[in-house]
Structures are given as C-alpha cells and as structure tokens.
C-alpha cells in the first residue's frame, strides 16, 4: 500500500528545511521469537535486555536501543510490512576485528563474510557479517 504518489511530490532543496535531524534514537526489529532473539543478542553480542511500558522488550547497548516486536503482535503504529529477517544492521565495536572473529566462532556462529573492508558513516571500517536467529544480516565493524 502506497501512502503517497512519489511522482507528485515537490521536493524542496534540503538547505531550505528548518528541521534538524540529529540521530537515530531507536529502531524496531520484528522477530519470530522474542526470547530467542534476546538470548542471541545477549550471549553473542553482549547487549542487555530491558522491559519497558506495557511489558515491551528492547535490547540496549551503548546509548542505543532496539525495540523488539513479536511477529503478528506488533505495536501500533508499525512498519507497512513488518517481516522477521529483513533487516541489515551494522554495529561498531572498539574490539579488534580479529578478536571479534574469534569470539563469534567460539560462540558457534558462522561468519557469512569477512573480515572485509567497507565504508562506514564516518570512514573506513573492517567488517564481518553474521546472521541472527531470524536471518537478519548483522555487520560487526571496527573503524580503521
């Protein structure tokens, strides 16, 4: 379902926009099993699970948060097509990437690709790719 006709939009030059977006506050992952997702992110990546209003679950790390929605029980409003396994996320680590590789392999997780050089938001990164229990692509990167 389209909410607007892209061809009919009249974009203004970005310099005319008064609003300033500073950062992403949180994102939402729709998952097939919240408990399995929490266990993976806690045990493999060291995130912490928290419960907030209405018994909602989230993962926190640093100053970031990922809200978790159970598939077919999403909170409103929600994405147009909430689908487990459709995310591609990049997490930055200060741990040397070779140490990350060792920890990931010791946890019994397969590395999809890497270490490989990529370009992050602020410079060059060295990355490895794994998948979470829903098949989301997880990139773990260190700035070089």
Swiss-Prot record:
Keyword set includes Metal-binding: no
Q: Which residues form the VOC domain?
A: 23-143
Signal peptide residues on this chain, from the entry's feature table: none
One Pfam family of this protein, by short name?
Glyoxalase
Q: What induces it?
A: Up-regulated following infection of host macrophages.
| Chaperone found in the keyword field | no
* Alphabetically ordered keywords of this record: Virulence
> What role is this protein assigned?
Is critically involved in promoting the replication of S.typhimurium cells inside host macrophages, suggesting a role in the establishment of bacterial colonization within macrophages. May be involved in the biosynthesis and modification of the peptidoglycan layer of the cell wall.
Q: What is this protein called?
A: Virulence protein STM3117
